[in-house]
Amino acid sequence: SCNNSCQQHSQCASHCVCLLNKCRTVN
């Protein structure tokens, strides 16, 4: 799943987005 913290999208997996400093699942 995508809920690690982030400052930018590159810190998240490719199927996630960085929003409000957390990685979130996106389709």
UniProtKB/Swiss-Prot annotation:
Cystine bridges: C2-C16, C6-C18, C12-C23
GO MF term set: ion channel regulator activity; toxin activity
GO CC terms: extracellular region
Key word Secreted present: yes
Modified residues (Asparagine amide): N27
Subcellular location: Secreted
Family: Belongs to the conotoxin P superfamily.
Its job: Probable neurotoxin that inhibits ion channels.
Entry protein name: Conotoxin
Organism: Conus amadis (Amadis cone)
